[in-house]
Protein backbone atom coordinates (compact mmCIF):
# COMPACT_ATOMS: atom_id res chain seq x y z
CA UNK A 1 0.00 0.00 0.00
CA UNK A 2 1.48 3.31 -1.11
CA UNK A 3 -0.62 5.58 1.10
CA UNK A 4 1.10 6.55 4.34
CA UNK A 5 -1.58 8.82 5.75
CA UNK A 6 -5.30 9.07 5.04
CA UNK A 7 -7.43 11.88 6.41
CA UNK A 8 -11.20 11.43 5.88
CA UNK A 9 -13.80 14.11 6.65
CA UNK A 10 -11.96 15.39 9.71
CA UNK A 11 -13.79 18.06 11.70
CA UNK A 12 -12.69 19.88 14.84
CA UNK A 13 -14.98 21.96 17.02
CA UNK A 14 -13.99 23.80 20.20
CA UNK A 15 -16.60 24.70 22.79
CA UNK A 16 -16.45 27.38 25.46
CA UNK A 17 -19.66 27.50 27.41
CA UNK A 18 -22.45 27.80 24.85
CA UNK A 19 -20.12 29.08 22.13
CA UNK A 20 -18.99 26.56 19.50
CA UNK A 21 -16.19 27.30 17.04
CA UNK A 22 -15.67 24.89 14.16
CA UNK A 23 -12.03 25.08 13.06
CA UNK A 24 -11.94 22.13 10.63
CA UNK A 25 -14.97 21.44 8.45
CA UNK A 26 -14.47 18.08 6.80
CA UNK A 27 -10.85 17.79 5.67
CA UNK A 28 -9.95 14.85 3.41
CA UNK A 29 -6.69 13.99 1.67
CA UNK A 30 -4.10 11.25 1.30
CA UNK A 31 -0.33 11.38 1.63
CA UNK A 32 1.92 8.87 -0.11
CA UNK A 33 5.14 7.42 1.23
CA UNK A 34 8.12 9.67 0.55
CA UNK A 35 5.95 12.56 -0.63
CA UNK A 36 6.72 16.25 -0.02
CA UNK A 37 3.48 18.16 0.55
CA UNK A 38 2.77 21.69 1.73
CA UNK A 39 -0.39 23.21 3.16
CA UNK A 40 -0.62 26.96 2.69
CA UNK A 41 -3.14 29.30 4.25
CA UNK A 42 -3.55 32.38 6.38
CA UNK A 43 -3.34 32.44 10.18
CA UNK A 44 -6.45 30.98 11.77
CA UNK A 45 -7.40 28.85 8.76
CA UNK A 46 -6.98 25.58 10.69
CA UNK A 47 -3.54 24.45 9.45
CA UNK A 48 -1.91 23.95 12.84
CA UNK A 49 -5.01 22.31 14.29
CA UNK A 50 -4.96 19.79 11.46
CA UNK A 51 -1.28 19.05 12.03
CA UNK A 52 -1.90 18.42 15.74
CA UNK A 53 -4.62 15.90 14.89
CA UNK A 54 -2.46 14.17 12.27
CA UNK A 55 0.33 13.87 14.85
CA UNK A 56 -1.98 12.33 17.48
CA UNK A 57 -1.50 15.39 19.68
CA UNK A 58 -5.22 16.21 19.58
CA UNK A 59 -8.41 14.35 18.71
CA UNK A 60 -10.78 15.12 15.86
CA UNK A 61 -14.40 15.87 16.76
CA UNK A 62 -15.52 13.87 13.72
CA UNK A 63 -13.87 11.93 10.91
CA UNK A 64 -10.92 9.58 10.81
CA UNK A 65 -7.13 9.69 10.45
CA UNK A 66 -5.33 6.53 9.37
CA UNK A 67 -1.54 6.36 9.66
CA UNK A 68 0.39 3.24 8.65
CA UNK A 69 -2.96 1.52 8.23
CA UNK A 70 -4.09 2.23 11.79
CA UNK A 71 -6.89 4.50 12.96
CA UNK A 72 -5.13 6.93 15.31
CA UNK A 73 -8.12 7.75 17.50
CA UNK A 74 -8.71 4.07 18.25
CA UNK A 75 -5.22 3.59 19.69
CA UNK A 76 -4.43 3.89 23.38
CA UNK A 77 -2.42 6.86 24.63
CA UNK A 78 0.63 4.61 25.03
CA UNK A 79 0.40 3.34 21.46
CA UNK A 80 -0.06 6.89 20.16
CA UNK A 81 3.06 7.94 22.07
CA UNK A 82 4.99 5.02 20.56
CA UNK A 83 3.95 6.07 17.06
CA UNK A 84 5.05 9.66 17.75
CA UNK A 85 8.43 8.46 19.00
CA UNK A 86 9.15 5.84 16.33
CA UNK A 87 7.27 6.88 13.20
CA UNK A 88 6.68 10.64 13.36
CA UNK A 89 8.98 13.65 13.54
CA UNK A 90 7.93 17.18 14.49
CA UNK A 91 9.40 20.56 13.56
CA UNK A 92 7.87 23.85 14.72
CA UNK A 93 8.29 27.57 14.05
CA UNK A 94 9.97 27.79 17.45
CA UNK A 95 12.65 25.13 17.72
CA UNK A 96 11.63 23.84 21.20
CA UNK A 97 15.18 22.70 21.89
CA UNK A 98 16.07 22.08 25.52
CA UNK A 99 18.06 25.13 26.61
CA UNK A 100 20.37 23.37 29.07
CA UNK A 101 21.40 20.63 26.65
CA UNK A 102 23.85 20.68 23.75
CA UNK A 103 22.85 20.21 20.13
CA UNK A 104 24.08 16.62 20.35
CA UNK A 105 22.07 15.91 23.49
CA UNK A 106 18.93 17.47 22.01
CA UNK A 107 19.14 15.31 18.89
CA UNK A 108 19.88 12.16 20.90
CA UNK A 109 16.91 12.71 23.24
CA UNK A 110 14.22 10.84 21.19
CA UNK A 111 16.55 7.84 20.93
CA UNK A 112 17.16 7.82 24.68
CA UNK A 113 13.42 8.09 25.34
CA UNK A 114 12.96 5.09 23.05
CA UNK A 115 15.42 3.05 25.14
CA UNK A 116 18.64 3.23 23.10
CA UNK A 117 21.89 3.21 25.07
CA UNK A 118 23.67 6.54 25.46
CA UNK A 119 26.76 5.78 23.38
CA UNK A 120 24.79 4.55 20.37
CA UNK A 121 22.29 7.42 20.63
CA UNK A 122 25.06 10.02 20.69
CA UNK A 123 26.81 8.38 17.74
CA UNK A 124 23.63 8.52 15.66
CA UNK A 125 23.01 12.12 16.72
CA UNK A 126 26.57 13.07 15.79
CA UNK A 127 26.19 11.52 12.34
CA UNK A 128 22.94 13.34 11.64
CA UNK A 129 24.25 16.69 12.86
CA UNK A 130 27.18 16.28 10.50
CA UNK A 131 24.71 15.59 7.70
CA UNK A 132 22.87 18.88 8.32
CA UNK A 133 26.15 20.79 8.39
CA UNK A 134 26.54 21.17 12.15
CA UNK A 135 29.24 18.65 12.96
CA UNK A 136 31.36 21.49 14.34
CA UNK A 137 28.55 22.76 16.61
CA UNK A 138 27.53 19.58 18.44
CA UNK A 139 28.68 20.81 21.86
CA UNK A 140 26.92 24.17 21.60
CA UNK A 141 23.69 24.95 23.42
CA UNK A 142 20.73 26.54 21.59
CA UNK A 143 21.58 30.03 22.89
CA UNK A 144 24.96 29.75 21.17
CA UNK A 145 23.45 28.91 17.76
CA UNK A 146 21.91 31.12 15.09
CA UNK A 147 18.23 30.82 14.17
CA UNK A 148 19.01 28.75 11.10
CA UNK A 149 21.35 26.49 13.06
CA UNK A 150 18.70 25.91 15.73
CA UNK A 151 16.19 24.84 13.07
CA UNK A 152 18.76 22.48 11.56
CA UNK A 153 19.18 20.91 14.99
CA UNK A 154 15.39 20.64 15.28
CA UNK A 155 15.20 18.95 11.87
CA UNK A 156 17.98 16.54 12.86
CA UNK A 157 16.08 15.70 16.05
CA UNK A 158 12.91 15.10 14.02
CA UNK A 159 14.76 12.69 11.71
CA UNK A 160 16.95 10.83 14.20
CA UNK A 161 14.49 7.93 14.62
CA UNK A 162 14.12 7.61 10.82
CA UNK A 163 10.40 8.43 10.90
CA UNK A 164 8.00 7.68 8.08
CA UNK A 165 6.63 11.24 8.24
CA UNK A 166 7.79 14.63 9.47
CA UNK A 167 5.10 17.18 10.36
CA UNK A 168 6.50 20.71 10.10
CA UNK A 169 4.46 23.68 11.34
CA UNK A 170 5.83 26.97 9.92
CA UNK A 171 9.41 25.64 10.24
CA UNK A 172 10.92 28.79 8.71
CA UNK A 173 8.51 31.37 10.15
CA UNK A 174 11.18 32.99 12.34
CA UNK A 175 13.95 32.96 9.72
CA UNK A 176 15.06 35.41 7.05
CA UNK A 177 14.21 34.49 3.47
CA UNK A 178 17.67 33.23 2.49
CA UNK A 179 17.92 30.99 5.55
CA UNK A 180 14.35 29.79 4.99
CA UNK A 181 15.21 28.72 1.45
CA UNK A 182 18.22 26.77 2.73
CA UNK A 183 16.03 24.94 5.27
CA UNK A 184 13.56 23.94 2.55
CA UNK A 185 16.42 22.78 0.32
CA UNK A 186 17.73 20.70 3.23
CA UNK A 187 14.33 19.06 3.72
CA UNK A 188 14.24 18.14 0.03
CA UNK A 189 17.73 16.64 0.21
CA UNK A 190 16.88 14.61 3.30
CA UNK A 191 13.66 13.44 1.67
CA UNK A 192 15.55 12.16 -1.37
CA UNK A 193 18.15 10.41 0.79
CA UNK A 194 15.90 8.81 3.39
CA UNK A 195 12.48 8.54 1.74
CA UNK A 196 10.89 10.28 4.72
CA UNK A 197 7.66 12.07 3.80
CA UNK A 198 7.23 15.73 4.80
CA UNK A 199 3.96 17.58 5.40
CA UNK A 200 4.81 21.26 5.79
CA UNK A 201 2.43 23.99 6.93
CA UNK A 202 3.38 27.49 5.79
CA UNK A 203 1.97 30.87 4.78
CA UNK A 204 4.76 31.45 2.24
CA UNK A 205 3.63 30.59 -1.29
CA UNK A 206 7.14 30.59 -2.75
CA UNK A 207 8.36 28.07 -0.21
CA UNK A 208 5.21 25.96 -0.55
CA UNK A 209 5.81 25.70 -4.30
CA UNK A 210 9.10 23.88 -3.59
CA UNK A 211 7.15 20.83 -2.47
CA UNK A 212 5.95 18.02 -4.77
CA UNK A 213 2.34 18.95 -4.11
CA UNK A 214 0.71 21.86 -2.34
CA UNK A 215 -2.74 22.31 -0.86
CA UNK A 216 -4.59 25.44 0.16
CA UNK A 217 -6.55 25.68 3.40
CA UNK A 218 -9.18 28.35 3.88
CA UNK A 219 -11.80 28.58 6.62
CA UNK A 220 -11.18 25.03 7.79
CA UNK A 221 -11.35 23.40 4.35
CA UNK A 222 -8.74 22.21 1.87
CA UNK A 223 -10.04 24.13 -1.14
CA UNK A 224 -7.34 23.54 -3.76
CA UNK A 225 -4.87 20.77 -4.49
CA UNK A 226 -2.17 21.31 -7.11
CA UNK A 227 0.74 19.27 -8.38
CA UNK A 228 -0.95 15.92 -7.74
Curated annotation (Swiss-Prot):
<dbReference type="GO" id="GO:0022857">
    <property type="term" value="F:transmembrane transporter activity"/>
</dbReference>
<dbReference type="GO" id="GO:0055085">
    <property type="term" value="P:transmembrane transport"/>
</dbReference>
<dbReference type="InterPro" id="IPR011924">
    <property type="entry name" value="LolD_lipo_ATP-bd"/>
</dbReference>
<dbReference type="InterPro" id="IPR017871">
    <property type="entry name" value="ABC_transporter-like_CS"/>
</dbReference>
<comment type="subunit">
    <text>The complex is composed of two ATP-binding proteins (LolD) and two transmembrane proteins (LolC and LolE).</text>
</comment>
<dbReference type="GO" id="GO:0016887">
    <property type="term" value="F:ATP hydrolysis activity"/>
</dbReference>
<keyword id="KW-1003">Cell membrane</keyword>
<keyword id="KW-1278">Translocase</keyword>
<feature type="binding site">
    <location>
        <begin position="41"/>
        <end position="48"/>
    </location>
    <ligand>
        <name>ATP</name>
    </ligand>
</feature>
<keyword id="KW-0067">ATP-binding</keyword>
<dbReference type="GO" id="GO:0005886">
    <property type="term" value="C:plasma membrane"/>
</dbReference>
<dbReference type="Pfam" id="PF00005">
    <property type="entry name" value="ABC_tran"/>
</dbReference>
<keyword id="KW-0547">Nucleotide-binding</keyword>
<dbReference type="GO" id="GO:0044874">
    <property type="term" value="P:lipoprotein localization to outer membrane"/>
</dbReference>
<comment type="function">
    <text>Part of the ABC transporter complex LolCDE involved in the translocation of mature outer membrane-directed lipoproteins, from the inner membrane to the periplasmic chaperone, LolA. Responsible for the formation of the LolA-lipoprotein complex in an ATP-dependent manner.</text>
</comment>
<comment type="similarity">
    <text>Belongs to the ABC transporter superfamily. Lipoprotein translocase (TC 3.A.1.125) family.</text>
</comment>
<dbReference type="InterPro" id="IPR027417">
    <property type="entry name" value="P-loop_NTPase"/>
</dbReference>
<keyword id="KW-0997">Cell inner membrane</keyword>
<dbReference type="InterPro" id="IPR017911">
    <property type="entry name" value="MacB-like_ATP-bd"/>
</dbReference>
<protein>
    <recommendedName>
        <fullName>Lipoprotein-releasing system ATP-binding protein LolD</fullName>
        <ecNumber>7.6.2.-</ecNumber>
    </recommendedName>
</protein>
<dbReference type="GO" id="GO:0005524">
    <property type="term" value="F:ATP binding"/>
</dbReference>
<dbReference type="GO" id="GO:0089705">
    <property type="term" value="P:protein localization to outer membrane"/>
</dbReference>
<keyword id="KW-0813">Transport</keyword>
<feature type="domain" description="ABC transporter">
    <location>
        <begin position="5"/>
        <end position="228"/>
    </location>
</feature>
<dbReference type="InterPro" id="IPR003593">
    <property type="entry name" value="AAA+_ATPase"/>
</dbReference>
<keyword id="KW-0472">Membrane</keyword>
<dbReference type="InterPro" id="IPR003439">
    <property type="entry name" value="ABC_transporter-like_ATP-bd"/>
</dbReference>
